[in-house]
Design a protein with these regions (language model features):
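A short glycine-rich, Lys/Arg-flanked "PGG" loop and its adjoining helix->strand segment in the class I
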Residues: 126-138
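Acceptor-substrate binding/catalytic loop of class I
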Residues: 119, 182-196
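A short acidic, Gly/Pro-enriched loop at the edge of an enzyme's catalytic core
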Residues: 100-110
């Protein structure tokens, strides 16, 4: 856990989601999908809020927002941003696996857009989903993001060829983990799922998936082109992407996937 906190200490998640079109696509797609459930007055809890790129937006939309973040430095940044924007957000430093400060059946929506990238044991993943089930009202919504292990293997081939070793790829494909000392710390503290595995996790914990989409589609593979779009071209590409991101054949190759599910 200390290594994970260190990974995100000093990380600028806001810039990551806005500095390039390829990352902006992730944010815009996620907000487009979540917007269907974020009417003013809705109670929304984000587990793994980082510096608040999403939680602050939810509050600006009129939602009653509770934000939980593991890394203390990120909590401080989010707190200051909320204060500067005069937004009322209930903010807690904590682990997505245990949020006792959030009341049972108190939330209309629970958003988990980062923790499942890093919960490396099956027990932890189930704990996080059980906490989501506990705090969400019956019939409420959970939104869960994950990183595809199949995409990560492709990223290694493209950017980190020194990791193309039998033992690295076998571990990644069989467990979703990367323990090789040559790997960047992000990968060593990560957990990378498969679309089927994440769906199973959600179903096992009392949710019914209603939508499963490829948040990035295949755009990461053509990042150089996407990042050099004009604003008009980006808008056109975004609209095309939003029409195709539910295509199941794109799920494994997309960097991020997103599942929307209802609490049974």
């Amino acid at each position: 856990m200390e290594e994970l906190i260190a990974q995100y200490t000093g990380a600028d998640e806001d810039s990551r989601l806005t500095r390039q079109y390829i990352a902006q696509l992730e944010y815009d797609t996620t907000m487009h999908v979540l917007g269907n459930y974020l009417q003013p007055g809705k109670r929304v809890c984000e587990l793994g809020a980082a510096t608040g790129r999403y939680s602050l937006k939810f509050a600006q939309m009129g939602c009653d927002v509770t934000a939980v973040e593991l890394a203390p430095e990120q909590v401080k940044i989010l707190s200051q941003k909320a204060k500067d924007a005069q937004l009322d957000i209930k903010l807690f430093q904590g682990n997505a696996c245990s949020v006792p400060f959030v009341a049972d059946s108190s939330q209309d929506v629970c958003v988990i857009l980062g923790p499942l990238y890093h919960l490396q044991t099956e027990e932890e993943r189930h704990q996080a989903m059980q906490e989501a089930k506990r705090i969400v009202k019956p019939g409420g919504i959970v939104a869960v993001a994950y990183i595809s292990r199949f995409f990560v293997a492709g990223m290694f081939a493209q950017k980190f060829p020194k990791l193309i070793k039998p033992e690295v790829l076998s571990e990644l494909l069989e467990t979703g983990l990367v323990s090789d000392s040559d790997a960047d710390s992000f990968f060593r503290v990560g957990y990378f799922s498969s679309p089927a595995e994440i769906e199973s996790l959600i179903i096992q914990n009392g949710f019914e998936p209603i939508r499963h989409l490829a948040t990035d589609g295949f755009s990461r593979y053509i990042a150089n082109g996407v990042n050099h779009f004009t604003p008009a071209q980006y808008d056109t590409w975004l609209q095309n992407h939003l029409q195709t991101c539910d295509e199941s054949s794109l799920l494994g190759s997309s960097n991020h996937g997103l599942i929307i599910a209802t609490r049974i």
